[in-house]
């Protein structure tokens, strides 16, 4: 009905809805680019666009920029990163940090030794027999995947016909290339049941650039990951609309219009020449978007895992121990979902990071209950004097490892996905479009910004 009335009045649907919602000219913001999402990719894009002389408006649902890059500060102001803990030490990273005048240094984990524990039994075990440690495993793995050089920048530049090895089950790829002794090390850098994954997605978690970064070392802001986004927020100022969500979007060949609602219920009409979408393109995230048939078809194909990052205090665990989960009953020691990936200590006494992964039904309540059960089991078995901890932060990193079937990839899914760039003045970036590591996302975002500039 709104569309028919808008056409009759000679208005865009969004402009009509703006009138219907009582939005007047004083509640309208005009910018060159409207950015949906102020996480790693959206914030980077905003700074780069500003440097190119463009005006921007960043729409972010949280009350902070940075997405998964969160930092908790203790009473003595010690920064504890959870979620994103560092960046690849590359020119892209260094230029960005220096551009925002954020002091940085090498990322050194807190001193600790690793205890291998089967978290299904609560008992100590050993590193999976016959499995290589990280450095040796990565060298063997990189040699096997060097044939897929088109993935070396983290973007899904997949040739057609698609190499069958690339879309084979990872377990089959392991056997074909005799990688059985490298599986556990690779699992520790993925998210999900690695034995059930398609090889492509394992590479996008621990490919050539990732292995190089692990060998060369990461960097991180000295005052915490959040310091980067605080600096960006200060520079962007009122161009960032925090605690704000899009309600209606209209896209044309010559511009876009977006109605957004802030936390206090205020509605604003944003008008832009281009739209940059950095949020995960799931159908449930795109309410209010009049999607094309191709967009709807592609975005309906996604599957993903649930990933939770917990920062806890007072667990009863020793301060100098990291717990690595090894399932001695499964092939290569790789746990089955849901599982606790690992428990890592922090630079502040008493604090630990706990990373939990599960399927689509592994919600926040289920994840917390699972975490408590595992800690109780460690206590019951006498492995550690654990008890129910204080949850300082419990952050959702869902969706993680967004993937589609081998049949979809073989049929040109990623080619069709990238063909969406620029249609109806809309561009896309973020973890769906490249490997989910900030440095690689920034590199791909630069490519998208070049496309926007030339369109």
Swiss-Prot record:
GO molecular function, one term: beta-cyclopiazonate dehydrogenase activity
Keyword Oxidoreductase: yes
Signal peptide interval: 1-25
Alphabetically ordered keywords of this record: FAD, Flavoprotein, Oxidoreductase, Signal, Virulence
Consequence of gene loss (knockout): Impairs the production of cyclopiazonic acid, but accumulates its biosynthetic intermediates cyclo-acetoacetyl-L-tryptophan and beta-cyclopiazonic acid.
InterPro entries per record: Amino_oxidase, FAD/NAD-bd_sf
E.C. number(s) listed in UniProt: 1.21.99.1
Catalytic activity entry: beta-cyclopiazonate + A = alpha-cyclopiazonate + AH2
Cofactor dependency: FAD
Similarity remark: Belongs to the beta-cyclopiazonate dehydrogenase family.
Purpose: Beta-cyclopiazonate dehydrogenase; part of the gene cluster that mediates the biosynthesis of the fungal neurotoxin cyclopiazonic acid (CPA), a nanomolar inhibitor of Ca(2+)-ATPase with a unique pentacyclic indole tetramic acid scaffold. The hybrid two module polyketide synthase-nonribosomal peptide synthetase (PKS-NRPS) cpaS incorporates acetyl-CoA, malonyl-CoA, and tryptophan (Trp) and utilizes a C-terminal redox-incompetent reductase domain to make and release the tryptophan tetramic acid, cyclo-acetoacetyl-L-tryptophan (c-AATrp), as the first intermediate in the pathway.
Annotated protein name in UniProt: Beta-cyclopiazonate dehydrogenase
Species this protein is from: Aspergillus oryzae (Yellow koji mold)
